[in-house]
Amino acid sequence: MAQKLWEKSVQVNKDIERFTVGRDREMDLYLAKHDVIGSMAHITMLESIGLLTKEELVQLLAELRNIYASAEKGEFVIEEGVEDVHSQVELMLTRRLGDIGKKIHSGRSRNDQVLLDLKLFTRTQIKEIAEAVEQLFHVLVNQSERYKDILMPGYTHLQIAMPSSFGLWFGAYAESVVDDMLFLQAAFKMCNRNPLGSAAGYGSSFPLDRTMTTRLLGFDSLNYNVVYAQMGRGKMERNVAFALATIAGTISKLAFDACMFNSQNFGFVKLPDDCTTGSSIMPHKKNPDVFELTRAKCNKLQSLPQQIMMIANNLPSGYFRDLQIIKEVFIPAFQELKDCLQMTTYIMNEIKVNEHILDDDKYLLIFSVEEVNRLAREGMPFRDAYKKVGLDIEAGKFSHGKEVHHTHEGSIGNLCNAEISALMQQTVEGFNFCGMEEAEKALLGR
């Protein structure tokens, strides 16, 4: 059985070990590639300050690239009795290279090592989320343009209110995800700062070159203060979780709209048949299960910042084992959101709209404001026009054509989709993922 990195002469109680390790080995498999990348940058820096020879560096880099390849293929495992990914990587190096493998931990603690792994993992996941959101955005904008002339009822208080359009409906969610991307971008910028070299949270007496590892790993800058670098554990995850929750909030609302509009009482849209399921007793049913599950998953994701906050709440500065538990709720959240984005993008691309909703006279009163505005434009004081139309409605005399003439920015007749698309493009460019990708390729020799 492998010796633990921290092991002394005291016998380990197996029940206590099981309790303290928990799901950490399972979660650490997500971090394996990133642990290797971090180690490659660290040992390159160690060689530059004389703690490794050039020959040792060459051997270590070659073996680390082999380990990375196994992780990339899904073949990397954390062996029984090995408590985390850091221990497994060091064990593999030591088995293959002997004492050289034992040198890679110089100037490093598992505290800054796991923080680095999490940041490398998280920024990669943020990139994938951003790409998925951008795909959804393009579908929404395209559908907004496609159906820009198709009117639908707008609601307030779930009461029919004013004319809207499918152009506005699709476009509203398109602009919403642009704002969501701003939160994601802010989270990325906070994440993309290098904690390596903070060690256990108080630095090292080794002359570490933290600027070098920052460059090698493609970070924007450092977490300069070593105490803050460790204090950022939990805070970084919470900030990212808030960005994920913001995106999830938009998708949840969209899913609710679509489920409601798909029901027979509304009949505004028709969801793809392959995204609905039947009933075991009612042969006519087509239940919007995919969007119902999407809504539930997104609502769960919206609780994630609170979960992380409660785990890290009331901790003083320094490292505490409490922080390990955050991984269990944080790491799986990315795939859950990506799944929801994939389903939503597919459904919104395939959804069919009812182009004749307003043929039903029950929607006639949504044009009451149009009539008030017409009278006001002709010179009648607005309040008098409002009263007249109200009396006509009460007397059953109200009538109005089923057309609208809105021209101001963001209205039915002027959706501003080009301007919204420009905002999205500007936001996407603001991430600047190129630096991290090029840095990791350079370390891997690709």
Predicted features by range, described:
Residues 2-203, 208-214, 221, 277-278, ...:
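A helix-coil-helix interface module used to build multimeric assemblies
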Residues 2-38, 99-100, 267, 282-446:
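Glycine-rich cofactor/substrate-binding loops
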Residues 44, 48, 69-76, 94, ...:
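Charged/polar positions within long, soluble alpha-helices
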Residues 60-61, 217, 262, 273-275, ...:
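A general structural motif at alpha-helix termini
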Residues 62-70, 231-234, 391-396:
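A short structural micro-motif
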Residues 105, 110-113, 157-164, 168, ...:
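Alpha-helix capping and helix-loop boundary segments enriched in small/acidic/polar residues
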Residues 119, 123-130, 134, 141, ...:
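Short amphipathic alpha-helical segments with heptad-repeat character
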Residues 217-305:
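Acidic, glycine-rich loop-and-beta core segments that form the ion-binding/anion-interacting portion
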